[in-house]
Amino acid sequence: MKVCDIPYQRCDVETVKKAYEKCIESIKNAKSADEVLAARKELLSVTEELNTESALSYMRWSCNTKDEFYKGEKEYYEQNAPLLSGVQIAYMQAMLSTPYRAEVEKRLPVTVYKNYEVSLKALDERIVPDLQEESAIVNEYAQFMSEFTVDFRGEKMPLTILRRYMEDGDRETRKEAFDALGKVFEENSEILDGTFDRLVKVRDRMAKKMGYKDFVELGYYRMGRLCYDREKVEKFRQNVLKDIVPVVSRIRTARAKSMGIDDMKLYDYGVCFADGDPTPILNAEQMFEKGREMYHEMSKETGEFIDMMIENDAFDVMSREGKWGGGYCTEFAKYKQPFILANFNGTSGDVDVLTHE
């Protein structure tokens, strides 16, 4: 099935809540590990539906942020999903406290219970209004940036297209592109600064309500970090400063010399060669065909996978006004279908999409 043909139907959050409540009751009344796992499996089929429909609404909004229907659907999940916090907490607590936990753990991936423990540190019914406010702010910013255009050499263009000129081989072109971007940022500084300020405050408020010193600690739990924490990252930053920064400085000095630049500026950092960095000689369609050849050469499985992705039109890679300006890979779990969004701009980054995403 082509991605554009996947049907969308809003998943009612209240129905999902009832599924959680049923699962919790079943786990508490379970007479064996099998019954616990059966209850979990039934719940996962419902949450898979929620995740699929939510991902579909987000994907279709990001492809066209002017689509009012999918904008509304996306906002529905953003505002209502936090209301599930209470039952999600109760479900994980039930899984952690079941007398059959030892046997259940043996039959699930080792990260399942670790994720329960970390997730419980990130959830609290007291912060539901704050989560809703946070989603609204993030959505406001995403909508603003998707409509963001820059005047450059008499043409209005989205930031995704301007980036091509920010990496141009001509230094004056790069400077002009950076100046154009800076001018628009300055003109909209009140909006951007205000958005950032509100986001910092609501996140700090959430963390304080949950008893954390600041949002950093809560942020690690929200991201599901299992193998490292704030202290380890602080040590890593010191290692970067001590071991990596000097190397990068030497490389940049050598690069500046090879490019004939005496004083490296911000607009020079993204370029490696005086006459400009290599750019694709193929158009998007040709690059995808070469990518298909590559994946077929790697293995039978990767060949079949890229064939499925291309045949199902599971890519949206061309930049255009009104399209969300980033890139991501998501999935529609119910249909076992991944999807990739990117914004080609004629740079080597276009090739990266076919390998990284």
What is each of the regions a protein language model found here?
Residues 1-278, 290:
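A well-structured
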Residues 279-284, 339-355:
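Short pre-active-site segment immediately N-terminal to the catalytic Zn-binding motif
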Residues 280-281, 315-336:
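Catalytic zinc-binding patch centered on the HExxH motif and its immediate surroundings
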Residues 149, 153, 204, 314-324:
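Conserved oxyanion/phosphate-binding beta-strand-loop segments in alpha/beta enzyme cores
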Residues 201, 334-337, 348:
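Short, well-ordered loop/turn elements at secondary-structure boundaries
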Residues 146-157, 300-307, 319:
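Proline-centered turn/helix-capping motifs that create local helix->coil transitions or kinks
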Residues 283-303:
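Carboxylate/His-rich catalytic cores and anion/metal-binding grooves
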